[in-house]
From Swiss-Prot:
Residues 1-59, 118-130, 201-244 are cytoplasmic. It is a multi-pass membrane protein. The modification Phosphotyrosine is found at Y219, Y225, Y229. Belongs to the MS4A family. This is High affinity immunoglobulin epsilon receptor subunit beta. The keyword Repressor does not apply. Residues 80-97, 151-180 are extracellular. Coiled coil: none annotated. One of its GO terms (molecular function) is IgE binding. It comes from Homo sapiens (Human).
Length: 244
């Protein structure tokens, strides 16, 4: 009887709250892991404002490059098909003789199309291809600006030497026409170069962002979470109740 009364007394005593804080188990579904939500929830610095703007305007910059290439190609086709630039003295069409309206248009059109495709499909190989193409277009654009500036100086020098004030003369008309065409192509090339450099910066930023969190580290953290979850859920390691 004494033993039974002691058991009832122990059961009637209030249980003191445990000082050890309870662990909150966070369940992670395989769908969240495969979709990359766990990777996104990891603490990572936010993107810069300028990089976010470039990412959103990637397709627009690609279209700008394509339009620049088409207009430069049209200028080159018209000048080379209508005029015999090889027999014009003064070298006022030196940029056309160098073929810049054609190979510059090829560089800008390729980089523009790759930028649009990579924005829509967002594949790794397309992003890297767009980065390489825009880097090449930046170099081609800088080279083209140098060629056009040299051509513009030669045209202005020709106009100044011959004192071209009567534009109905053939030579003066050619020099003035060359100056206007070269100025427009220079403006378009600067526009295309700005787009190519912006897309190059955007692609480089995406590459650096992708290399910040290694895949091995992510899998290691997943293994730690899985082991902790299995230990908390394993009923075999729980202490058996003490019989009083």
């Amino acid at each position: 009887m004494d033993t039974e009364s002691n058991r009832r007394a122990n059961l009637a005593l209030p249980q003191e709250p445990s000082s050890v804080p309870a662990f909150e188990v966070l369940e992670i579904s395989p769908q969240e892991v495969s979709s990359g939500r766990l990777l996104k929830s990891a603490s990572s610095p936010p993107l810069h404002t300028w990089l976010t703007v470039l990412k959103k305007e990637q397709e627009f910059l690609g279209v700008t490059q394509i339009l620049t290439a088409m207009i430069c190609l049209c200028f080159g086709t018209v000048v080379c098909s209508v005029l015999d630039i090889s027999h014009i003295e003064g070298d006022i069409f030196s940029s056309f003789k160098a073929g810049y309206p054609f190979w510059g248009a090829i560089f800008f059109s390729i980089s523009g199309m790759l930028s649009i495709i990579s924005e829509r499909r967002n594949a790794t190989y397309l992003v890297r291809g767009s980065l390489g193409a825009n880097t090449a277009s930046s170099i081609a654009g800088g080279t083209g600006i140098t060629i056009l500036i040299i051509n513009l100086k030669k045209s202005l020098a020709y106009i100044h030497i011959h004192s071209c004030q009567k534009f109905f003369e053939t030579k003066c008309f050619m020099a003035s026409f060359s100056t206007e065409i070269v100025v427009m192509m220079l403006f378009l090339t600067i526009l295309g170069l700005g787009s190519a450099v912006s897309l190059t910066i955007c692609g480089a930023g995406e590459e650096l962002k992708g290399n910040k969190v290694p895949e091995d580290r992510v899998y290691e953290e997943l293994n730690i979470y899985s082991a902790t979850y299995s230990e908390l859920e394993d009923p075999g390691e729980m202490s058996p109740p003490i019989d009083l």
